Amino acid sequence: MADLAKIVEDLSSLTVLEAAELAKLLEEKWGVSAAAAVAVAAGPAGGGAAAPAAEEQTEFTVVLASAGDKKIEVIKEVRAITGLGLKEAKDLVEGAPKPVKESVAKDEAEKLKAQLEKAGAKVELK
């Protein structure tokens, strides 16, 4: 147990950048993806909530279907919405269809959809 306590203490002292680098190294070492684990963990919770809300959906996922002709404008808008860095936003836009924002209220989802469409993107709400 002393070894585990030492590991916890060491991990707690990492900066955000160091923690991100550690995550990348562990993903490579173990051949896994942290994004896949988050999607799997979020899947059952979303599925259980969707059944009772069959009458009217209250939470939406804003999905970028395609960037359209104005990719740079769409990347700028994705950065503004998500707070992602330039490379991450570019990867998201180029990897479309991808979710831009998940579990948002209907009003916010409609607003985000309008922003992205104004920039030239094709957007879906799910």
Swiss-Prot record:
Record keywords: Ribonucleoprotein, Ribosomal protein
Superkingdom assignment: Bacteria
One annotated GO biological process: translation
InterPro entries according to UniProt: Ribosomal_bL12, Ribosomal_bL12_C, Ribosomal_bL12_C/ClpS-like, Ribosomal_bL12_oligo, Ribosomal_bL12_oligo_N_sf
A molecular-function term among this protein's GO annotations: mRNA binding
One Pfam family named in its UniProt record: Ribosomal_L12_N
GO cellular component assignments: cytosolic large ribosomal subunit
Free-text function comment from the UniProt entry: Forms part of the ribosomal stalk which helps the ribosome interact with GTP-bound translation factors. Is thus essential for accurate translation.
HAMAP family per the UniProt record, alphabetical: Ribosomal_bL12
Protein family: Belongs to the bacterial ribosomal protein bL12 family.
Description of how the protein assembles with itself and partners: Homodimer. Part of the ribosomal stalk of the 50S ribosomal subunit. Forms a multimeric L10(L12)X complex, where L10 forms an elongated spine to which 2 to 4 L12 dimers bind in a sequential fashion. Binds GTP-bound translation factors.
Protein name: Large ribosomal subunit protein bL12
Organism: Methylorubrum populi (strain ATCC BAA-705 / NCIMB 13946 / BJ001) (Methylobacterium populi)
